[in-house]
Amino acid sequence: MPFVVAIPARFSASRLPGKPLRLLGGRPLIHRVAERALSTGAREVWVATDDVRIAEAVASLDGVHVAMTANTHLSGSDRLAECARIAGWDPEVCVVNLQGDEPFAPAAGIRAVAALLHHSNADMATLATTIDKSEDLFNPNIVKLVCNTHGEALYFSRAPIPWNRDTFATTREPTPLGPWLRHIGLYACNAGFLQRFTTMQPGTLEQIESLEQLRVLEAGHRIAVRITPEHFPPGIDTPEDLAKAEKALEDV
């Protein structure tokens, strides 16, 4: 199924300022993410940014387009809606939102989220993977989610969900067969839905959790979820994450 990849990138990340231009293996992080996108066979790859420094860094990459967007967007999806207008995509074009802090996202997983949207009746599609480490379950930078029996998201949270009332009263170790899932910050929706997203008001849940996908659920829309077999290392949110990613790159 044809799709495009769009990468929202802003310079003023609160936990890691200048994140897209931080070096990973001697190259800007945004370069590594964009090259992952190019490896998927996407019809087009775009970086949407409000910072000329990021735009100039991306300009040296063959096959990557840049959309200069407003600096007032509340979320990456809001930014990509403007990117879609700049690019002139038809409303039915499948847009994969690849976060700018996912330099190790496997190409197969990126293609899979586009396929999931195509084969589902949901308005949006995303990926998740299982959690088996307590430090991940209780880390607020790692987003958790719960799904219904139809493989659709019920809720996303920075808190450990579901909360095991009995087990967590005595230990913080998740059971090996527990239902805990880590959300992978990769979305697919069509360009028309991106425009609808911008008309939805951020709700209380989105504002409390600082999770844009909750705007979709609060507005009554559906998000299909695939439990992915591909390995997705956590994204880079902090200096510690960047150091871990550097080490992982050295170990390859």
UniProtKB/Swiss-Prot annotation:
One of its GO terms (cellular component) is cytosol. It catalyses: 3-deoxy-alpha-D-manno-oct-2-ulosonate + CTP = CMP-3-deoxy-beta-D-manno-octulosonate + diphosphate. One of its GO terms (biological process) is lipopolysaccharide biosynthetic process. Pathway: Nucleotide-sugar biosynthesis; CMP-3-deoxy-D-manno-octulosonate biosynthesis; CMP-3-deoxy-D-manno-octulosonate from 3-deoxy-D-manno-octulosonate and CTP: step 1/1; Bacterial outer membrane biogenesis; lipopolysaccharide biosynthesis. Its main location: cytoplasm. Its EC number is 2.7.7.38. GO terms for molecular function: 3-deoxy-manno-octulosonate cytidylyltransferase activity. It holds the Pfam family CTP_transf_3. It is an enzyme of class 2 (transferase). InterPro entries: Cytidylyl_trans (IPR003329), KdsB (IPR004528), Nucleotide-diphossugar_trans (IPR029044). It is found in: Cytoplasm. CDD domains: CMP-KDO-Synthetase (cd02517). Keywords: Cytoplasm, Lipopolysaccharide biosynthesis, Nucleotidyltransferase, Transferase. Belongs to the KdsB family. Activates KDO (a required 8-carbon sugar) for incorporation into bacterial lipopolysaccharide in Gram-negative bacteria. NCBIfam families: kdsB, PRK05450.1-5. This is 3-deoxy-manno-octulosonate cytidylyltransferase.
